[in-house]
Amino acid sequence: MLNRSSKAADFPLAAAFGIYTAAFLAVASPWLLGFVEVPWDSVSTFYPPFAFLARSIATGQSPFWTPNIFAGWPQIADPQALIFSPLHLLVALIDPKPTPRLFDGLTFGLLYIGGAGVILLFRDRGWHAAAAVAAALAFSLGGSAASRIQHIGQLQSLVFLPLAILMLSRALEHSSWLAGAAAGLFASFIVLGRDQVALVGAYVLVGFVLWHWLDGPGRGARFVASLKPLIAGVVVGACIITVPVALTVLLAQSSNRPDITFAHAVQGSLHPASLLMLAFADVFGASDFHREFWGPPSIPWHELIGQTGLYDSQNTGQIYTGALVAVSLLAFTLTRGVLWAREVRFFTVAAAMTLLYAFGKYTPVFGLLYGYLPGVSLYRRPADATFVLCGLLAIVSGYLIHRLLTGTLPLRRWQTVVAVLAVAAMVAISIVLARWAGMLESAVLPLLWGCGFLLVAVGALVLARRLAPQSAAAAAFVLAIYCAADFAWNNAPNESTGLPSSMYGALRSDTDDETLVLLRAKLKASAAPDRRDRVEMIGVAYHFPNIGLIHDLDHLYGHNPLRLALFEDATGAPDTVAAVRGPFTPLLPSYRSPLEDLFGVRFLAFGQPIEKLDPSVKPDDFPLVGRTKDAYVYENPRALPRVLLATRWQQADFAAMLRNGGWPDVDYQRTVLLERAPAVAPNSETPGTVRIMLYENTDIEIESDAPSGGFVVLNDIWHPWWRASVDGKPADILKANVLFRAVVVPPGKHVVRFKFEPLSGGWAELRSKLHAAPN
């Protein structure tokens, strides 16, 4: 057990937080003041669901299902919906129309929490306040958290890790069930991310417990003493995560990604050459608007150095965690026993294991983990582990700085020689690679800047060491100023992290974007009691696919790596339609098809003329009704209403239709396709009427008047968590026309209600899967 109480009492906590806050705000100011916004996935994948969450709460609706994307989507099971993000949920409860700028503020709020947790962890361990501030800034403003700030869910999975470790450490050392419960709370916030960063973070916490049990004598006593706090933590965590995680697992099993093959996963490995960016932030040109990216797996690298077999974005390998981190690791890692000291040994091993995980196919370790460690096979891109890796490196380097500032780090001349040689080797490797790739001229300036920052970092450490005995706050101030300058320059807004706010006017609730204004006007003009027309927006802008979540437009597609397998099989929907929609399918062979009409796609906004996307369409098939600066807007005059009253039915093999296409030649306003005959099967020529009485996210009421009975067909995606009733009595929801919903109604006037019930529906689905599983 560490004796920390006296050292913690001497820790200038207020000064540390004040200095950390000032430096943090200085670096974050371009975003917080609204000059730039976090782009790409932040504005396309995460902000729209957040706006939908706030809008739903403000209008008294449940946010658990949305009709605005993919013909219907279970938000409650989607980690990107942010429903279970404590910070986002709190703000959504308060603000009905949160702006993108506020959303960026919450993003930096998450990062701030991560750094604050590091300071508290250092204080608890009796480590130097100046080292705590340096580590906190590296954790919150460096590494993958900075370069991949657009991935909001992964940030959330990371930032609570220091607080979880802090409370877990207290729980284990003091056998405190209160601390254990707090550890379970913060651990649950990590797991609620339900992504690979959450998985790696969870395993770090598991490893922390195992380390506590096994490290040193008295293992049995430690194990027994830990049971009470661990049980408290497990109970608290289980109460929070069980439902969201279970629903996400069920969604994944019915999605386009029920699992990830090893070959697919390792396409997202971290290339070893990316380690050069620990010291040289932009040696490969990954964040410079005016330079060509040449690192792995770019085109120059593949053409002139060799194929990598990787499929990563250019910012995946940007792991620059600050020059202080690089200097401390390069200069002091080889100091005998320092990183193996008991108080930091776990973090050293955890960082090493996380690095091996991130390397993916480049070591045998990931293959073993993929095969034997639960959860690993669910995710692609092991390089996502760099979020946790960089956070752990910030803590380890902070410990090294603590040892330096407290005079307990043995300093020898050979350490300086080794550090210089290490930097020289990294420079030499960078130059050789740049020459091979034909990018030497592009790499020289970043290398010079990197060497300059490393040199100044040495000076900052020397000055801080001199000031530390007299004033911990003064030493912290020196290191904070340096870190702020370092990150303000090397992690400044770039094409991956910060683009002008003026680019995203369409995201605002009061937008005057001409494409959206035109679509809204057309939809209003086409409104009818049985209609809720959909739109299709392809190739307009990166942030458009999910924009319906903000403005309550029902877009046929969206932006999400997950789609229901049924929907993807039917439509060929890709992750996003920001550029192109992807290939057509047998069931949807053209925009001129029965499925497009059944979806009720009335208006189509394309970034290029429709005939370029679908050469098979004829000029009169889709009249051009508008031309904006971003889109050609067409009308589909054949789009069917959202609700239909079919009085006839015809049997069809849906699986064969998905494979081969071939829609029967029937009138889909009067005839519904079913896989099997229902218990009561109306078949009449007598028409009826149907109208929408209520259409909310999770509650839909439809009034039908069928003299001879019939089928109320709702052209929303079929999903097992929906329930139906006719005049208040439970009714079966039939899968209709391959992927839609239908309910049998008897003769006369009736009210059909569709209700989304994820808890009972999810439980029923889970039970059916368990019963169907082999014994």
Regions found by a protein language model. Give the residues of each.
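Hydrophobic alpha-helical membrane-insertion signals
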Residues: 6-77, 101, 241, 246-258, ...
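Membrane-interface coil-to-helix junctions
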Residues: 23-118, 137-162, 264-323, 358-376, ...
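Transmembrane helix irregularities
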Residues: 94, 141, 145, 172, ...
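Transmembrane-helix signature of polytopic, membrane-embedded enzymes
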Residues: 118-140
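Contiguous transmembrane helix-bundle modules in multi-pass membrane proteins
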Residues: 136, 151-160, 167-185, 197-198, ...
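Polar, glycine-rich mid-to-C-terminal structural blocks
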Residues: 197, 225-282, 476
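Active-site-proximal, structured, solvent-exposed surfaces of multi-pass membrane proteins
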Residues: 356, 546, 557, 668-775
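Extracytoplasmic/lumenal acceptor-recognition loop(s) of multi-pass membrane glycoenzymes
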Residues: 476-601, 628, 633-680, 719, ...
